[in-house]
A protein has these predicted regions:
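Active-site phosphate-binding strand-loop segment of PLP-dependent enzymes
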Residues: 117-171, 186
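Active-site C-terminal subdomain of aminotransferase-like
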Residues: 16-17, 192-286, 390-394
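Conserved beta-loop-alpha segment that forms the PLP phosphate-binding cup at the N-terminus of a helix
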Residues: 55-84, 88, 92-97
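Conserved PLP-binding catalytic core of the aspartate aminotransferase-like
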Residues: 291-324
C-alpha cells in the first residue's frame, strides 16, 4: 500500500514551496555553458548577494548545505589550528566532527540546548585561549528552535582577529544579515528553509579575509575537490567557468525564490517570519504547553519548539496529525528526540496566518484525540490575536 502524501508539509525543512517555484524549476534544461545559463547563474549570484545584504562574494555550491559546512572546515582549517566552537544545540556539536576531521583543535564553549551563547562568555573564552584562529557558531539551531546572537558574537571574534564560520542554514530569510557590519567571514545557508526553496544547493557569503585564509591553508590550499570553495572562486568568480556541472534545475529554483523574496522586500520578508513565530508561541502557550527555549528572546524565527508534557506520547501525537489529518510536523532531533516537537513556519508557504491556523487547529484536535485535553480553538484564537497588523497586500 502506498503511503498517502500529507496535505500540509509543516516540518522543519525541506519546506513546502510556492507554485511559481515549482513551475520555474521545471523549465527546459540548458547546457551549463549556454550563454543563457551563464547569464542566469550570474544573475542568481547577484540576487543572493542582495538577500545576504552584502558586497562579499556569493558562492553557490552544488549540494545541500551540509556540503557547504564541511567545505568551510575543509577549505579553512589547517592541522593544529585552534577553533572555538560554540555549542547550543545538535548542529553546533556536530560541527566539531568537521573541525577534527581536518586536523583542527576544538575548544568548546557549550550551553544547555534550550539556551543561547552569551557574547561575553565568548570574550572570556578567547582571552583564556590565545591563538584561536577560527570561531564556528550556528545562528539558528533548528532542532531546538533557538538562535544565537551572531552579530555580537562575530564582533567579539573580530576584536581578537578571529575569523568566523557561521551556520545560517535556517537563519537566512528569518533575520536581516549584514556580513560586513557583523563580521561574518563565511556564512553558509540553504534555500530549503526560510527562503522556501528546494533542497540541493549551498548558499555562501565569503569575505576577503576568508579567501586569504583559504589560500594560506597548510600544507596548501584545498584544490581539485568537491569541497573546495577556492575552486569556485577561480572557476566561476574569476573565469565564468564551473568546477563541475551545476544542478541546472536547482539553480532555476533558487533564482525563482530569490526573486520572490526580494519582490516582497527583505525587511518585510523577515518581519513576516518574526510575526508568525511570535503568533505561534502565543498559540502554543494558550494550549497550556511550554516552549522549549528558555526565553522568547532566543526563540528562532523558523520553528517553534514545544516541550513534551508529562504523560504525552509525542510520537502518537505526530502520527495522529500526519495520518488522521494530513499535517506533517517534526520531532526532536538527535539528543532532543522525545523531549520536544517542532512546529515549522518558514518560507512563504509556511510562514502565513492561514497555514499557522491550520497547523494549530490540527495540533489542538490531535492533542484531544491522544488523551491530552485542551480547549479547542484556544491556540488558534491566541495566535490570530497576536498577528496584529498582518496584511498580504501591504
Amino acid at each position: 500500500m502506498t503511503t498517502q502524501w500529507p496535505r500540509l508539509n509543516l516540518a522543519a525543512g525541506p519546506v513546502e514551496v510556492m507554485p511559481r517555484t515549482l513551475r520555474d524549476q521545471g523549465r527546459p534544461i540548458l547546457y551549463h555553458y549556454d550563454p543563457a545559463f551563464i547569464e542566469l547563474f550570474a544573475r542568481t549570484s547577484g540576487l543572493l548577494q542582495q538577500v545576504f545584504r552584502t558586497e562579499y562574494d556569493a558562492v553557490i555550491m552544488q549540494g545541500e548545505a551540509i556540503l557547504g559546512l564541511e567545505a568551510a572546515a575543509a577549505s579553512l582549517i589547517s592541522p593544529g589550528d585552534k577553533v572555538l566552537n560554540l555549542v547550543s544545540g545538535v548542529f553546533g556539536k556536530w560541527f566539531e566532527d568537521f573541525i577534527e576531521k581536518y586536523g583542527g583543535e576544538t575548544i568548546e564553549l557549550a550551553v544547555p540546548y534550550d539556551d543561547a551563547v552569551d557574547p561575553e562568555d565568548v570574550r572570556r573564552a578567547l582571552h583564556a585561549n590565545p591563538g584561536v584562529k577560527f570561531l564556528s557558531v550556528v545562528h539558528s539551531e533548528t532542532p531546538s528552535g533557538t538562535h544565537n546572537p551572531v552579530r555580537d558574537i562575530c564582533r567579539v571574534a573580530h576584536e581578537f582577529g578571529v575569523l568566523t564560520m557561521i551556520d545560517t542554514v535556517s537563519g537566512l530569510g528569518g533575520e536581516l544579515y549584514s556580513p560586513e557590519e557583523w563580521g561574518m567571514d563565511v556564512a553558509v545557508a540553504g534555500p530549503q528553509k526560510c527562503l522556501g526553496g528546494t533542497p540541493g544547493l549551498t548558499l555562501m557569503s565569503v569575505s576577503p579575509a576568508a579567501w586569504a585564509a583559504m589560500e594560506a591553508r597548510r600544507p596548501g590550499p584545498l584544490r581539485g575537490s568537491f569541497l573546495s570553495i577556492l575552486d569556485w572562486k577561480s572557476a566561476w568568480l574569476e573565469g565564468r567557468r564551473f568546477p563541475y556541472t551545476p544542478s541546472v534545475s536547482e539553480v532555476y529554483s533558487l533564482e525563482s525564490v530569490l526573486e520572490q523574496t526580494l519582490a516582497i522586500g527583505m525587511e518585510r520578508f523577515v518581519d513576516r517570519h518574526q510575526l508568525i513565530a511570535a503568533a505561534a508561541r502565543a498559540g502554543v502557550r494558550a494550549l497550556g504547553l511550554d516552549l522549549w527555549p528558555a526565553r522568547d528572546e532566543i526563540a528562532a524565527a523558523c520553528v517553534t519548539a514545544v516541550t513534551v508534557p508529562d504523560g504525552l506520547d509525542e510520537a502518537l501525537l505526530r502520527k495522529t496529525m500526519r495520518h488522521r489529518y494530513g499535517v506533517m510536523i517534526s520531532p526532536g532531533y538527535g539528543s532532543l528526540q522525545g523531549k520536544l516537537f517542532r512546529l515549522a513556519h518558514m518560507g512563504p508557504a509556511q510562514a502565513h496566518p492561514t497555514t499557522l491556523a491550520a497547523q494549530l487547529a490540527v495540533l489542538e484536535r490531535s492533542l484531544v484525540d491522544v488523551g491530552h485535553p485542551v480547549a479547542l480553538g484556544a491556540g488558534v484564537g491566541a495566535a490570530m490575536a497576536a498577528l496584529g497588523n498582518w496584511n498580504d497586500e501591504a
